[in-house]
Amino acid sequence: MTSKDTLEHSIIFNQEIYPDTVQELMDRMTQYPIVNLYFSTDGGELDTMLVLIDFLNRRAEQGNVRVYLSSYCSSAGTLLLTDYNGPLYVQPTFRFFYFHVPDFMSYKFRKVVNEDRLRDLLLAYNETYYEKLKVVGLTRKQIDTIRKGHELYIFADELGKLKTTFITDEFEDRTLLYKPYDPPIIKK
């Protein structure tokens, strides 16, 4: 990904997903040829998250971004699992993905908008999202939990059950190694 003469830049993003925070992040990232993005979020707007993922996918195609999961990814942040095409690097501090039924934050729309049509569009979007979750490796039971309006957490020690390949990096004898992520083993 990098040559010895290319300097990498690291950016920490641990904010909610809104147009101003995402635009600021993208503007910062475009200032550097190679970015290590340490990402954590409480969630936010789905459409804004999809804009960010489109941006990250374009950079990933060029090989000039690494997305590190740090702390947790909630709500709209889970779209990294379903829509981001690059590898996801896992920090030792990553704890969980938090899923719930997606919504369009319809309280932001004026009441003159046909609420039945908005609900129909949302339900259609949600079905597409559930199909993507199935591809990622969530079980039917897990998806049904989300569909019924309940919360679902996938903790760091459960990431190995998903079909997504997660990567971790480790320094060994002063050499940076990239290897598949092994979830921690939690004794109960």
Residue ranges and their predicted role:
Residues 1-76, 83-188:
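N-terminal organellar transit peptides
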